[in-house]
From Swiss-Prot:
Residues 1-75 are annotated as: Required for H3K9me2-binding. GO terms for molecular function: histone H3K9me2/3 reader activity; methylated histone binding. GO terms for biological process: embryonic cleavage; epigenetic programing of female pronucleus. Residues 1-32 are annotated as: Disordered. Primordial germ cell (PGCs)-specific protein involved in epigenetic chromatin reprogramming in the zygote following fertilization. In zygotes, DNA demethylation occurs selectively in the paternal pronucleus before the first cell division, while the adjacent maternal pronucleus and certain paternally-imprinted loci are protected from this process. GO terms for cellular component: chromatin; cytoplasm; cytosol; female pronucleus; male pronucleus; nucleoplasm; nucleus. Keywords: Chromatin regulator, Cytoplasm, Developmental protein, Nucleus. Mediates binding to H3K9me2 via N-terminal region, while ability to exclude TET3 from the maternal pronucleus requires the C-terminal part. It is found in: Nucleus; Cytoplasm. This is Developmental pluripotency-associated protein 3.
């Protein structure tokens, strides 16, 4: 006859629940116990033909799809999208501007014609400030002086 210690209850079989628990642990959590980790590591191969599980592929795709950024980078990107980059206006960029070139050439030609035709009179040409602000804005100090006198 069998002794009570030798009886095997199918529900209390020490090997099968442990295997089921290990499989459930692999499926449910990403954190593995050291014993389970050793068993899983033994199953690994260097064969590239081994197919990866769909779960791991989906996790990898989700990780790759979401860019890593912190809060400050997100705020900076939102601000930059609201205000697009504009070029800085410098003296060189003004000199390269084709419309500004045409204006300068016309002004130079008019001045040369007046000088050649002896049309130059001292009071005919008003004072022009040569600073960059007046040059860029086409600001006429004589007009502003007249406004101040009123």
């Amino acid at each position: 006859m069998e002794e009570p210690s030798e009886k095997v209850d199918p529900m209390k079989d020490p090997e099968t629940p442990q295997k089921k628990d290990e499989e459930d642990a692999l499926d449910d959590t990403d954190v593995l116990q050291p014993e389970t980790l050793v068993k899983v590591m033994k199953k690994l191969t260097l064969n590239p033909g081994v197919k990866r599980s769909a779960r791991r592929r989906s996790l990898r795709n989700r990780i790759a799809a979401v860019p890593v950024e912190n809060k400050s980078e997100k705020i900076r990107r939102e601000v930059q999208s609201a205000f697009p980059k504009r070029r800085v206006r410098t003296l060189l960029s003004v000199l390269k501007d084709p419309i500004a070139k045409m204006r300068r050439l016309v002004r130079i030609e008019q001045r040369q014609k007046r000088l050649e035709g002896n049309e130059f009179e001292r009071d005919s040409e008003p004072f022009r400030c040569l600073c960059t602000f007046c040059h860029y804005q086409r600001w006429d100090p004589s007009e502003n002086a007249k406004i101040g006198k009123n």
